[in-house]
């Protein structure tokens, strides 16, 4: 008699359970001594589920994947806006209230300015050489200065304007071709997720490497195989970089890779290196051989940075690692925000009408939107801000690690505590937002006040705040608003035939739409505005 799929599944589940039991008993013998060291200290901590000895709430976490959803469900059941979850020897503090979040990131920012050192961030940062994922210390300070002063300064932002414009123009060209040519999906049907993610990937490649394509140039302006593989690897890293891997809390299990996170991140990082490294090596050789003498992109800037002794400021490993982290940072929020916003606006056509009317009034229909128009596009910016509030990319912000015993309110948090600010719960907190689940850009419009995508009071999280705030606010805001503005100004959007309304169902294990948004686009400007210099 053959082995049935059900029997094999049972064996796999039994093996996993048995292995966990063995691991837990092993931990009891190995860590009881170290665990007892902390018993002399009594900390008053927020409420939370009763932990098991030694392993804490790890069994519940492993039984309720994904952990992000389990934590939110747990806090809702407990009716609390701050909780304490013990995962082995790690204390995790999720927060869903903006007022409490500000206590951590504004009042006590200096104490919570570090990051945990875990398997996924070790791999993604190539040994903690970058900025966002790196613990507080000299390496972080060094790389933060590089970003702020050399890559993302106002001067560099203006220097790179032409490259950003090229990719905004190419986006128009690509969507126009989808409108006007018979394609596999039918004339005019556009996969918004692919288009928006491709735009983010294009901007990254153009700013860093001065190219749109790693492989063959696609005549329709769309992504080729290499670009699709690259962007997919980027989102894989984003998915697993802080995914509550069991080895984050029991480090000696890293090599066993019980949940598969390590292999997935390693594979994705291999893809990133496959495309990045040859370009970086060749560019360094060009500079060393005197074949290149003028800086043309941010890779050139990184290579030519000098220290006080006029020696290269960055090592080859630091350059590679920081470029990969920039790729991760540049592609996520703009694409996800626009996909959700367009879906919401198609179900509320009056919002779509108001946005296009604003664009027509500010820009007209004889030219394309430019970055210089952004200050006047208050409603478009409000739509983007509302999308970031209601539909964040991740459940939690990057963890903040407590660097010393710290009193916050009535609680004393021990050194090593990890604080997680819930992006989804902060933005949907009914105490701070009226009708929080409704997409309502109007809530962000106030007479005489410019709409911005930042939120220093942490009523939602876009670029966060404090020492670990994102240094790329200007670039991130520009990319997001230009994506919204170009797509809404350049095309009329409608649901596919026989679809009465857009399905706004959220994915079961992340915050993407359950199905990629595929809608019909029609050009609303003169045909010559959609062509680019490259393809004329």
Curated annotation (Swiss-Prot):
Any one GO molecular function term: heme binding
Pathway: Secondary metabolite biosynthesis
UniProt-listed SUPFAM superfamilies: Cytochrome P450
Membrane topology: Single-pass type II membrane protein
This protein's name: Isoleucine N-monooxygenase 2
Biological role: Involved in the biosynthesis of the cyanogenic glucosides linamarin and lotaustralin and of the nitirle glucosides rhodiocyanoside A and D. Can use L-isoleucine > L-valine as substrate, but not L-leucine, L-phenylalanine or L-tyrosine.
Pfam family, one: p450
One GO process term, biological-process aspect: cyanogenic glycoside biosynthetic process
UniProt cofactor(s): heme
Membrane side Cytoplasmic: residue ranges: 1-8
Catalytic activity field: L-isoleucine + 2 reduced [NADPH--hemoprotein reductase] + 2 O2 = (1E,2S)-2-methylbutanal oxime + 2 oxidized [NADPH--hemoprotein reductase] + CO2 + 3 H2O + 2 H(+); L-isoleucine + reduced [NADPH--hemoprotein reductase] + O2 = N-hydroxy-L-isoleucine + oxidized [NADPH--hemoprotein reductase] + H2O + 2 H(+); N-hydroxy-L-isoleucine + reduced [NADPH--hemoprotein reductase] + O2 = N,N-dihydroxy-L-isoleucine + oxidized [NADPH--hemoprotein reductase] + H2O + H(+); L-valine + 2 reduced [NADPH--hemoprotein reductase] + 2 O2 = (E)-2-methylpropanal oxime + 2 oxidized [NADPH--hemoprotein reductase] + CO2 + 3 H2O + 2 H(+)
Assigned keywords, A-Z: Endoplasmic reticulum, Glycoprotein, Heme, Iron, Membrane, Metal-binding, Microsome, Monooxygenase, Oxidoreductase, Signal-anchor, Transmembrane, Transmembrane helix
InterPro entries: Cyt_P450, Cyt_P450_E_grp-I, Cyt_P450_sf
Higher taxonomy: Eukaryota, Viridiplantae, Streptophyta, Embryophyta, Tracheophyta
Segments on the Lumenal face: 30-536
Family: Belongs to the cytochrome P450 family.
Annotated TM spans: 9-29
Residues linked to a glycan: 38, 232, 404, 498
């Amino acid at each position: 008699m053959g082995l049935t799929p059900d029997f094999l599944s049972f064996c796999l589940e039994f093996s996993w359970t048995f292995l966990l039991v063995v691991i837990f008993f092993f931990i009891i013998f190995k860590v009881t001594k170290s665990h007892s060291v902390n018993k002399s200290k009594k900390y008053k901590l927020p409420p939370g589920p009763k932990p098991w000895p030694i392993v804490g709430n790890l069994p519940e976490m492993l039984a309720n994947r994904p952990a992000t959803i389990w934590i939110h469900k747990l806090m809702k059941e407990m009716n609390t806006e701050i909780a304490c979850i013990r995962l082995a020897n790690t204390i995790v503090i999720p927060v869903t209230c903006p007022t409490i979040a500000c206590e951590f990131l504004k009042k006590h920012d200096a104490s919570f300015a570090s990051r945990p050192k875990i398997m996924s961030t070790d791999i993604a940062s190539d040994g903690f050489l970058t900025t966002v994922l790196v613990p507080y210390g000299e390496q972080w300070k060094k790389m933060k200065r590089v970003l702020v002063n050399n890559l993302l300064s106002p001067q560099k932002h203006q220097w790179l304007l032409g490259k950003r414009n090229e990719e905004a123009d190419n986006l128009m060209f690509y969507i126009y071709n989808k409108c006007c040519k018979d394609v596999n999906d039918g004339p005019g049907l556009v996969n918004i997720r692919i288009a928006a993610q491709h735009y983010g990937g294009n901007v990254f490649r153009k700013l860093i490497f001065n190219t749109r394509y790693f492989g063959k140039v696609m005549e329709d302006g769309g992504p080729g195989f290499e670009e699709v593989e690259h962007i997919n690897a980027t989102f894989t890293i984003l998915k697993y970089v802080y995914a509550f891997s069991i080895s984050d809390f029991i480090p000696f299990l890293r090599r066993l890779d019980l949940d598969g996170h390590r292999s997935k991140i390693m594979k994705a990082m291999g893809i990133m290196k496959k495309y990045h490294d040859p370009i970086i090596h060749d560019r360094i050789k060009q500079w060393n051989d005197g074949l290149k003498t003028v800086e043309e992109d941010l890779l050139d800037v990184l290579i030519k940075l000098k220290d006080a002794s006029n020696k290269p400021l960055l090592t080859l490993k630091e350059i590679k690692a920081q470029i990969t982290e920039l790729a991760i940072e540049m592609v996520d929020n703009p694409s996800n925000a626009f996909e959700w916003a367009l879906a919401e606006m198609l179900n509320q056509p009056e919002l779509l009408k108001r946005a296009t009317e604003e664009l027509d009034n500010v820009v007209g229909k004889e030219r394309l939107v430019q970055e210089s128009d952004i200050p006047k596009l208050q409603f478009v910016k409000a739509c983007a801000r509302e999308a970031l509030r209601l539909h964040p990319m991740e459940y939690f912000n990057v963890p903040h690690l407590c660097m010393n015993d710290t009193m916050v309110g009535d609680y004393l948090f021990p050194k090593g505590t990890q604080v997680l600010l819930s992006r989804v719960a902060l933005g949907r907190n009914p105490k701070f937002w009226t009708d929080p689940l409704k997409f309502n850009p109007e809530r962000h419009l106030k007479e005489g006040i410019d709409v911005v995508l930042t939120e220093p009071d942490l009523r939602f999280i876009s670029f966060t705040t404090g020492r670990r705030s994102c240094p790329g606010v200007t670039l991130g805001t520009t990319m997001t608003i230009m994506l919204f503005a170009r797509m809404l100004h350049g095309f009329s959007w409608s649901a596919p035939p026989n679809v009465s309304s857009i399905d706004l169902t959220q994915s079961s294990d992340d915050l993407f739409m359950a199905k990629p948004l595929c809608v019909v686009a029609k050009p609303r400007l003169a045909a010559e505005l959609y062509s680019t210099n490259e393809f004329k």
